[in-house]
Amino acid sequence: MTQVTFKHNPVTLVGTERKVGDKAPNFTVVNRDLEEVTLHDYDGKVRLISVVPSIDTSVCSTQTRKFNEEASNLDNTVVLTISVDLPFAQKKWCAAEGLPNAITLSDHRDLSFGEAYGVIMKELRLLARSVFVVNAVGEIVYTEVVPEGSDHPNYEAAIEAAKKA
C-alpha cells in the first residue's frame, strides 16, 4: 500500500489499491444536484479522475482548475473531480471559480469511490490526493497517489496518459 502523509503526518489509506492494468471498479457518488452518478455513466469515454481532499483549498482548487482547462482540449475525455465535500459546497465553489461545467462529485455518503480505489485517509475521513485515468474500455491506464497531501499531482503525466488512452 502506498505511504501517504497529510500535512507531513502519516495517514492510513483504506480500500483496495489500484494499479495500471486493473479493470476500473464502478462506484456511486453524488453530483451537485444530489443525483447519483456512477463511473459507468461515462462508459465509452476516457475518464480522468481527479481526487482532492477538499475542493475549497488552494492546491485542490488549482488541481481542479488545471485538469479541467487541460482536458478541455482532449477528444472523448471527461474530467471527474471527486472529494468528500458536500455537493452544496462543490456547487458554490464551481460558481465562485467560474467553472460551471466542471463535473464535481461527492463521495460523502458512503465513500464508495474511496473504498474502491484505496484512497480513504482513515484518520481524517478524507480522500487522498490522487489521479486515475481510465480508458474508454474501462481499464486503468494511469495512477498517482500523491505522497504528501499538500503537494500537487504530476499534471503533465496524467494529461499525457489521457491523450494516449
UniProtKB/Swiss-Prot annotation:
Keyword vocabulary terms for this entry: Antioxidant, Disulfide bond, Oxidoreductase, Peroxidase, Redox-active center
Thioredoxin domain segment(s): 18-164
Pfam families recorded: Redoxin
Domain of life: Bacteria
Annotated S-S bridges: 60-94
Gene3D superfamilies to which the protein is assigned, alphabetical: Glutaredoxin (3.40.30.10)
UniProt GO MF annotations: thioredoxin peroxidase activity
Biological role stated in the UniProt entry: Thiol-specific peroxidase that catalyzes the reduction of hydrogen peroxide and organic hydroperoxides to water and alcohols, respectively. Plays a role in cell protection against oxidative stress by detoxifying peroxides.
Note: The active site is a conserved redox-active cysteine residue, the peroxidatic cysteine (C(P)), which makes the nucleophilic attack on the peroxide substrate. The peroxide oxidizes the C(P)-SH to cysteine sulfenic acid (C(P)-SOH), which then reacts with another cysteine residue, the resolving cysteine (C(R)), to form a disulfide bridge. The disulfide is subsequently reduced by an appropriate electron donor to complete the catalytic cycle. In this atypical 2-Cys peroxiredoxin, C(R) is present in the same subunit to form an intramolecular disulfide.
Annotated PANTHER family: THIOL PEROXIDASE
Protein name according to UniProt: Thiol peroxidase
